């Protein structure tokens, strides 16, 4: 008899883990709260560093889960720990007795309207990174011939007042990627990036930063934006301080893009509350061991993959999903031997 594995969350981590568990011979039940699989990847256009299509990447991931029991628009209604299994009642009325559970609930984006000084939801010209990516994906750009566009890094990240002092890890690279892409669409526009510190830490990240400056002429201003105001002509005046020169600056823009950071998924936290999963100070879930067992929760048979334990890049998420599948396989086999 095949062991049942419940995977909660149908983003990249859930898809990759489900595919690996299916190949190992397990009966995988994958649930996703949205109407479509893919999580945030389903809303993206091109991916860093190679500019590959997010659509094609998602298609490759979903092709691998053929044969997996997959339920969209479904959430965990109740979850209980039994002896060495989990009893889950799903919102579609199905009950699952799972030998192991993988939580891959991903992340939520910070609600940019909470930073009122930036004017999101107030001024038409202020959008988020997700809004811009949607425009790229749908090929419906919001402006005709803009003269200047700005990007604000760390919106809702590294911000005590916003309740998140931690770095969201991917925002700097995403901002630089999108700044380059916006120059491809509007080559005559001036593009500015307002940043605290540029954290271009991964392979090819520094190359992208240099390319942004040398090939696209993007201006990087180290400093916090303090105020955004709409002018009579509908353009935006941005006040900031250039911390390298210690001088206040004002820039007039046609559009301002806010790089909204990652926050813990509320859907994931709802699951966690049902079985008292522990979280870190930032709200993301705690692993059994942050070095040796990051995919394991502190409960037997309950595992994590992806951004539910903290901000991650897509490659890191996929690597972690494969690792989580192996950890689940080892756990099941060890339990089988004990019986």
Give, region by region, the residue ranges found by the protein language model.
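Residues forming the flavin
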Residues: 1-339
């Amino acid at each position: 008899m095949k062991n049942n594995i419940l995977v909660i969350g149908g983003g990249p981590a859930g898809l990759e883990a489900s595919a690996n568990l299916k190949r190992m011979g397990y009966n995988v039940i994958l649930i996703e709260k949205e109407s479509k699989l893919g999580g945030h990847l389903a809303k993206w256009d091109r991916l860093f560093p190679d500019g590959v299509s997010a659509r094609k990447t998602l298609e490759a991931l979903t092709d691998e889960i053929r044969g997996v029991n997959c339920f969209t628009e479904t959430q965990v209604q109740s979850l209980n720990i039994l002896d060495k299994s989990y009893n889950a009642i799903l919102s579609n009325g199905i009950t699952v007795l799972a030998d192991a559970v993988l939580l891959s609930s991903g992340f939520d984006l910070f609600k940019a309207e909470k930073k009122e000084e930036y004017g999101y939801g107030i001024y038409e010209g202020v959008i988020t990174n997700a809004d811009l990516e949607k425009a790229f994906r749908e090929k419906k750009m919001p402006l005709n011939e803009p003269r200047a566009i700005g990007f604000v890094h760390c919106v809702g990240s590294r911000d005590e007042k916003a309740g998140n002092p931690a770095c969201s890890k991917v925002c700097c690279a995403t901002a630089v990627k999108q700044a380059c892409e916006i120059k491809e669409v509007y080559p005559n526009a001036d593009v500015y990036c307002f940043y605290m510190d540029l954290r271009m830490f991964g392979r090819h990240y520094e190359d992208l930063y240099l390319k942004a400056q040398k090939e696209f002429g993007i201006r990087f201003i180290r400093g916090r934006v303090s105020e955004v105001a709409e002018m009579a002509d509908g353009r935006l005046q941005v006040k900031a301080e250039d911390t390298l020169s210690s001088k206040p600056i004002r820039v007039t823009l046609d559009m301002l893009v806010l790089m909204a950071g990652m926050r813990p998924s509320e859907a994931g936290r709802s699951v966690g509350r049902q079985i008292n999963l522990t979280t870190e100070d930032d709200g993301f879930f705690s692993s059994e061991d942050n070095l040796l067992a990051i995919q394991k929760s502190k409960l037997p048979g309950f595992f994590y993959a992806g951004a539910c334990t903290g901000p991650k890049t897509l490659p890191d998420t996929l690597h972690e999903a494969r690792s989580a599948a192996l950890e689940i396989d080892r756990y099941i086999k060890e339990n089988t031997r004990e019986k």
